[in-house]
Each structure stands twice: as structure tokens, then as C-alpha cells.
């Protein structure tokens, strides 16, 4: 199944690169990535994103030249959590096979529950309800949890629950429950888990149990995912390509969805 999907994705990319494709097919490609700038949300204890110009203008030789430098923690903005982030001995970001960075997108919508409960946790019942409507989650899928939280981006106070640097005691946003993480890790064969909040775990978590379970099963995470409201519950194909940092525990990722 996964090999067929990869071939289909290659075919799609060939179509999109063809003559005239931009006029007819670009509406079927969704960018699931928040831009990186000084407002990009990072974990309260992490070094935020910083970019500055090194050169910008006409060179001594009379031609235009521009260059910049950036710095940041691995974990912030739209990024990928490598399994080694919370899974000892598991894959670093450069060790994740390319075949696992693409797959069918499964979008589980819990926006209604999260609207009235900021600390809501995805349950196993939410997952099985999705399956009753759409069929069992296929092997190699990338499960995306839609909480509706991206509407608060980049307002740190509303998105995280606190805009105080270093404050991890007063965070409030949705995430996964232990039972949901265990269900996906043990009863399904997913490659990745994405969410439109700052963490796979809810903001109130102190032990990051969803990270422990999923990363421990060599499942990577995608956090601060954008534009989930533009994807159907099933049928889209996701491509998530992170910066290839040797030995990295995570890094910025460009996520693209191809609509059916």
C-alpha cells in the first residue's frame, strides 16, 4: 500500500511540474506550515527564532547580493519531533526513512470539544468514531488532530495559555490522552502524528506521556501544523520534509498536502 502511495505521489509531483499545471492544479496543494519570523511561537523555555541580514544591497562589483543568518531551537514553529525526542535509542531526524515522511492523511476533528474545553484530550473513542465513519486507519497513515487552535496563531497568550517566557506551569491547549496515544501506537501502524497545537500532549501535561508513548514506538510528531481546516477527513496525501539535521531531535518542517 505504501509503495503504491509513493508512486502516486511521484506522479502527482510530475503533473504539478508540467506545463500549465500552475493554472489548473495548484488549488489542490495546501501549505500546512506557518512562516518563521520573530512572532513564531516556540516552547516557553526554548530559544526563539531570530533572523538578521548579513548583506543586503548592491555589491562592490555592481550586482545585487543578499544573505542572512538565523538561529533557533529545534522545537518551535511548524516542526517535526524525531522519535529520539522522547524515545531513547529511537530515530534521529536524519534517520527517518523518506517513505515514512509521506502518507495518507487521516484528519480527526475535535474542534467542537476543544471550543468548550481548552485542555481537552483526544480519546480512543474519538479515534474509533472516526473509523466508524471512514474505515480503519490505514497502515502508514499520518494522523492529524484538528483542534481549531491554529486560529489563535501567533497570539502566544491565546495559543499557549501564557505569554510569559519560561512559564510552563500555566499552559492550556488540547492534546492527546494516554489512551489515544496507546491506541495509535499499539493497535494501528501509523508513521506520524500531527496536531495544530504546540505539543502532542495537552498544555497541562507534566509528564508528556503521549510523547513518551508515540516516540517510544518510533512514531514522529508534527506540531504547530497550519491549515488543517482545508483538509478532508480522508483522501489527502501528506508530505512532510524536515531540515536534515544529523543527530537532530527535531527541526523545522515544510508540510504539504495534496487534495484528492
What do the predicted segments below correspond to?
Residues 7-15:
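Bacterial N-terminal signal peptides
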Residues 1-4:
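Positively charged n-region of N-terminal signal peptides that target proteins for export
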Residues 20-260:
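Active-/binding-site microenvironments in catalytic and ligand-binding cores
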Amino acid at each position: 500500500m505504501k509503495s503504491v502511495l509513493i508512486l502516486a505521489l511521484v506522479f502527482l509531483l510530475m503533473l504539478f511540474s508540467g506545463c500549465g499545471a500552475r493554472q489548473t492544479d495548484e488549488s489542490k496543494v495546501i501549505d500546512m506550515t506557518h512562516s518563521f519570523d520573530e512572532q513564531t511561537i516556540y516552547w516557553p523555555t526554548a530559544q526563539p527564532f531570530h533572523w538578521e541580514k548579513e548583506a543586503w544591497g548592491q555589491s562592490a562589483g555592481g550586482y545585487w547580493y543578499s544573505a542572512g543568518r538565523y538561529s533557533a531551537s529545534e522545537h518551535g514553529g511548524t516542526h517535526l519531533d524525531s522519535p529520539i525526542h522522547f524515545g531513547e535509542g529511537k530515530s534521529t531526524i536524519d534517520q527517518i526513512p523518506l517513505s515514512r515522511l509521506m502518507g495518507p492523511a487521516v484528519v480527526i476533528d475535535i474542534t467542537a470539544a476543544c471550543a468548550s474545553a481548552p485542555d481537552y484530550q483526544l480519546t480512543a473513542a474519538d479515534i474509533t468514531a472516526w473509523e466508524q465513519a471512514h474505515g480503519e486507519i490505514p497502515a502508514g497513515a499520518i494522523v492529524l488532530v484538528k483542534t481549531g487552535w491554529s486560529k489563535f496563531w501567533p497570539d502566544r497568550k491565546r495559543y499557549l495559555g501564557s505569554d510569559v517566557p519560561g512559564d510552563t506551569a500555566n499552559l492550556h491547549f488540547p492534546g492527546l490522552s494516554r489512551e489515544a496515544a496507546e491506541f495509535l501506537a499499539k493497535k494501528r501502524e501509523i508513521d506520524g502524528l500531527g496536531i495544530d497545537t504546540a505539543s502532542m500532549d495537552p498544555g497541562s501535561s507534566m509528564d508528556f506521556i503521549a510523547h513518551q508513548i508515540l516516540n517510544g514506538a518510533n512514531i514522529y510528531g508534527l506540531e504547530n501544523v497550519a491549515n488543517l481546516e482545508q483538509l478532508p477527513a480522508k483522501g489527502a496525501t501528506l508530505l512532510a520534509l524536515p531540515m536534515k539535521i544529523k543527530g537532530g531531535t527535531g527541526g523545522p518542517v515544510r508540510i504539504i498536502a495534496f487534495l484528492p
